[in-house]
Protein backbone atom coordinates (compact mmCIF):
# COMPACT_ATOMS: atom_id res chain seq x y z
CA UNK A 1 0.00 0.00 0.00
CA UNK A 2 1.23 3.46 -0.87
CA UNK A 3 0.74 6.01 1.89
CA UNK A 4 0.72 9.82 2.16
CA UNK A 5 -1.37 10.41 -0.94
CA UNK A 6 -3.45 13.60 -1.16
CA UNK A 7 -6.49 12.20 -2.96
CA UNK A 8 -10.20 12.67 -2.21
CA UNK A 9 -13.49 11.60 -3.77
CA UNK A 10 -16.15 14.23 -4.37
CA UNK A 11 -19.69 13.88 -5.69
CA UNK A 12 -21.08 16.28 -8.28
CA UNK A 13 -24.67 17.53 -8.14
CA UNK A 14 -25.76 14.81 -10.60
CA UNK A 15 -24.26 12.07 -8.41
CA UNK A 16 -21.16 11.53 -10.55
CA UNK A 17 -18.10 10.76 -8.45
CA UNK A 18 -14.74 12.34 -9.26
CA UNK A 19 -11.37 11.45 -7.77
CA UNK A 20 -9.52 14.70 -7.04
CA UNK A 21 -5.75 14.31 -7.10
CA UNK A 22 -4.37 17.23 -5.11
CA UNK A 23 -0.69 16.33 -5.18
CA UNK A 24 1.12 16.10 -8.51
CA UNK A 25 3.67 13.31 -8.06
CA UNK A 26 4.91 13.24 -11.67
CA UNK A 27 5.58 16.75 -12.94
CA UNK A 28 6.05 17.98 -16.50
CA UNK A 29 4.13 17.17 -19.66
CA UNK A 30 6.94 16.49 -22.10
CA UNK A 31 9.36 14.16 -20.36
CA UNK A 32 7.58 11.95 -17.86
CA UNK A 33 9.92 9.38 -16.36
CA UNK A 34 7.79 6.28 -16.92
CA UNK A 35 10.34 4.15 -15.05
CA UNK A 36 9.53 6.18 -11.91
CA UNK A 37 5.80 5.65 -12.55
CA UNK A 38 6.45 1.91 -12.94
CA UNK A 39 8.32 1.76 -9.62
CA UNK A 40 5.56 3.76 -7.91
CA UNK A 41 2.88 1.34 -9.15
CA UNK A 42 4.81 -1.63 -7.75
CA UNK A 43 3.91 -0.26 -4.32
CA UNK A 44 0.33 -1.46 -4.89
CA UNK A 45 1.18 -5.08 -5.78
CA UNK A 46 -0.71 -7.48 -3.54
CA UNK A 47 -3.35 -4.92 -2.54
CA UNK A 48 -7.02 -5.08 -3.45
CA UNK A 49 -9.71 -2.43 -3.46
CA UNK A 50 -13.49 -2.61 -3.61
CA UNK A 51 -15.81 -1.00 -6.14
CA UNK A 52 -18.34 0.89 -4.00
CA UNK A 53 -21.43 0.32 -6.12
CA UNK A 54 -20.96 -3.46 -6.52
CA UNK A 55 -18.63 -4.54 -3.67
CA UNK A 56 -16.45 -6.34 -6.25
CA UNK A 57 -12.81 -6.73 -5.25
CA UNK A 58 -10.19 -5.62 -7.76
CA UNK A 59 -6.68 -6.89 -7.11
CA UNK A 60 -3.38 -5.33 -8.07
CA UNK A 61 -1.07 -7.91 -9.61
CA UNK A 62 2.47 -7.75 -10.89
CA UNK A 63 1.43 -7.11 -14.51
CA UNK A 64 -0.11 -3.68 -13.85
CA UNK A 65 3.12 -1.67 -13.58
CA UNK A 66 4.52 -2.95 -16.88
CA UNK A 67 1.29 -2.68 -18.88
CA UNK A 68 0.44 0.75 -17.42
CA UNK A 69 3.80 2.22 -18.41
CA UNK A 70 4.73 0.31 -21.57
CA UNK A 71 1.48 -0.40 -23.44
CA UNK A 72 0.87 0.85 -26.96
CA UNK A 73 -1.98 2.99 -25.59
CA UNK A 74 0.40 4.69 -23.15
CA UNK A 75 3.03 5.29 -25.82
CA UNK A 76 0.41 7.07 -27.93
CA UNK A 77 -0.36 9.57 -25.13
CA UNK A 78 1.15 13.05 -25.35
CA UNK A 79 1.16 16.23 -23.29
CA UNK A 80 -1.56 16.73 -20.69
CA UNK A 81 -3.09 13.27 -21.25
CA UNK A 82 0.27 11.58 -20.59
CA UNK A 83 0.71 13.67 -17.43
CA UNK A 84 -2.84 12.76 -16.38
CA UNK A 85 -2.15 9.03 -16.77
CA UNK A 86 1.12 9.28 -14.85
CA UNK A 87 -0.57 11.09 -11.96
CA UNK A 88 -3.64 8.85 -11.99
CA UNK A 89 -1.22 6.22 -10.65
CA UNK A 90 -1.39 7.99 -7.28
CA UNK A 91 -5.17 7.49 -7.15
CA UNK A 92 -5.55 3.80 -8.06
CA UNK A 93 -7.47 2.87 -4.85
CA UNK A 94 -9.97 5.70 -5.26
CA UNK A 95 -10.40 5.14 -9.00
CA UNK A 96 -11.30 1.52 -8.33
CA UNK A 97 -13.69 2.63 -5.58
CA UNK A 98 -15.67 4.93 -7.93
CA UNK A 99 -15.59 2.62 -10.98
CA UNK A 100 -18.99 2.35 -12.64
CA UNK A 101 -20.81 1.23 -15.76
CA UNK A 102 -19.00 -2.11 -16.29
CA UNK A 103 -18.83 -3.45 -19.82
CA UNK A 104 -17.76 -7.08 -20.32
CA UNK A 105 -16.01 -8.42 -23.39
CA UNK A 106 -14.65 -11.81 -24.29
CA UNK A 107 -10.91 -12.38 -24.36
CA UNK A 108 -9.71 -12.45 -27.97
CA UNK A 109 -5.96 -12.94 -27.60
CA UNK A 110 -4.38 -16.34 -27.04
CA UNK A 111 -1.56 -14.77 -25.00
CA UNK A 112 -4.18 -13.65 -22.43
CA UNK A 113 -6.04 -16.99 -22.19
CA UNK A 114 -4.89 -17.64 -18.62
CA UNK A 115 -5.01 -14.15 -17.13
CA UNK A 116 -8.29 -13.23 -18.83
CA UNK A 117 -9.94 -16.65 -18.97
CA UNK A 118 -13.30 -15.12 -18.02
CA UNK A 119 -12.88 -12.00 -20.14
CA UNK A 120 -12.26 -8.30 -19.66
CA UNK A 121 -14.21 -5.54 -17.97
CA UNK A 122 -14.04 -1.83 -18.67
CA UNK A 123 -15.26 0.58 -16.00
CA UNK A 124 -15.81 4.31 -16.35
CA UNK A 125 -13.96 6.69 -14.02
CA UNK A 126 -13.40 10.44 -13.71
CA UNK A 127 -10.52 12.23 -12.05
CA UNK A 128 -9.28 15.78 -11.63
CA UNK A 129 -5.74 17.13 -11.84
CA UNK A 130 -4.84 20.59 -10.48
CA UNK A 131 -3.53 23.30 -12.80
CA UNK A 132 -1.11 25.81 -11.32
CA UNK A 133 0.15 29.20 -12.48
CA UNK A 134 3.33 30.24 -10.68
CA UNK A 135 2.58 27.69 -7.94
CA UNK A 136 -0.93 29.11 -7.40
CA UNK A 137 -3.83 26.73 -7.97
CA UNK A 138 -6.08 28.20 -10.66
CA UNK A 139 -8.39 25.28 -11.57
CA UNK A 140 -8.75 21.53 -12.01
CA UNK A 141 -8.84 19.75 -15.34
CA UNK A 142 -11.29 16.84 -15.40
CA UNK A 143 -10.48 13.62 -17.25
CA UNK A 144 -12.62 10.65 -18.17
CA UNK A 145 -11.00 7.23 -18.50
CA UNK A 146 -11.64 3.50 -18.47
CA UNK A 147 -10.19 0.98 -16.05
CA UNK A 148 -9.30 -2.23 -17.89
CA UNK A 149 -9.73 -5.25 -15.62
CA UNK A 150 -8.99 -8.87 -16.49
CA UNK A 151 -11.03 -11.72 -14.96
CA UNK A 152 -8.40 -14.37 -14.31
CA UNK A 153 -8.47 -18.17 -14.30
CA UNK A 154 -8.37 -18.02 -10.46
CA UNK A 155 -11.68 -16.14 -10.42
CA UNK A 156 -10.13 -12.85 -9.28
CA UNK A 157 -10.31 -9.57 -11.15
CA UNK A 158 -7.08 -7.62 -11.65
CA UNK A 159 -6.53 -4.03 -12.73
CA UNK A 160 -4.58 -4.26 -15.98
CA UNK A 161 -4.41 -0.67 -17.26
CA UNK A 162 -6.15 2.69 -17.48
CA UNK A 163 -7.22 3.51 -21.03
CA UNK A 164 -9.04 6.12 -23.08
CA UNK A 165 -7.90 9.05 -20.96
CA UNK A 166 -9.54 12.17 -22.32
CA UNK A 167 -9.73 15.67 -20.95
CA UNK A 168 -13.29 16.91 -20.65
CA UNK A 169 -13.86 19.95 -22.79
CA UNK A 170 -16.51 21.48 -20.56
CA UNK A 171 -15.50 24.47 -18.51
CA UNK A 172 -12.74 23.75 -15.97
CA UNK A 173 -13.80 23.05 -12.40
CA UNK A 174 -13.11 25.25 -9.42
CA UNK A 175 -13.89 22.98 -6.51
CA UNK A 176 -14.87 24.41 -3.18
CA UNK A 177 -15.26 22.18 -0.19
How would you describe each model-predicted region?
Residues 1-177:
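Ribonuclease/tRNase effector modules and their secretory precursors
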Amino acid sequence: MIENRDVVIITEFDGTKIVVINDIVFKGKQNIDWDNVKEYLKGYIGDFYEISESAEKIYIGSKLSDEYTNSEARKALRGANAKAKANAASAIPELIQIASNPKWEENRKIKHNDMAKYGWYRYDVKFAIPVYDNEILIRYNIYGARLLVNHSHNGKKYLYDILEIKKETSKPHHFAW
